[in-house]
Each structure stands twice: as structure tokens, then as C-alpha cells.
């Protein structure tokens, strides 16, 4: 809603691009939506003032911003436009391996070790450049850790 009448860019062929096009049609937001061939060009368009905002998955935006010469010149804002479950793919008939993965994921979550792992990779400086993404845990991820399961809730 805050973007009504603005010019947005997103990367060609991505889910966020499809979602914003649909939202624009359904909510009559009057957005100008531009497709960029890749993330680098979309980010460049925002930095050069050719677009007001770059719509993309939050983790990608945090990563792109963190690697700019002045990361504080960009800010990731707003609510989720889409939610897309991510998963671990295992060999279909390897029951023993699935059990190991399930048990370890459950242990990481119930012991709260998952928070330290998250902090290590998303809040603290990481290799190779020692850049921090500064990406806080989303409410959706935090809620998913309350009830560990191997079922996708969608």
C-alpha cells in the first residue's frame, strides 16, 4: 500500500515479480513494474534512482545490501508479499538418513542451538569478506521453530 504509484523493479522470472504484478492488478495500486535481467541490475536501478524499490526475497536483499560499498544506504522494509517454504531434499527411500536429519533438526530447535547457528550466519560477519547480513529472524521462521515438523504448512 505504501508503494502506490511508485516504480518497482524485480528480477525477471521470479516469484516476487509475479506476486507484485498480481497484487498490482487486484488492488489497483498503479505501480509501474520493471523487469531487470538479474539482481545486480535491479539493485543498480534503485541506487541510480531509476526505480523506487527492488522487490525480492528478503534473504537475497539482505545479502545484496550487505555487499554494497555503503550497506547503510539501503534498507530492507515491509511485510512479506509471498511466503515460500524451503526444504531439505533427501533420497526418497533412505529412511535411516531421514531419521538422522529429522532428529538433528529437532535437537537443534529444542536445544535452541538453532539460534546460535542462525546468528552465526545471518547476524555476524561471515566469510569470505567478513560481511554481516544483519538479517533478524523473521516471525515466520521463529514460529516454525516452536513446533518442529517435516510437513510443509502450505
Over which residues does each language-model region extend?
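Proline/Glycine/Serine-rich low-complexity intrinsically disordered segments
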Residues: 1-154
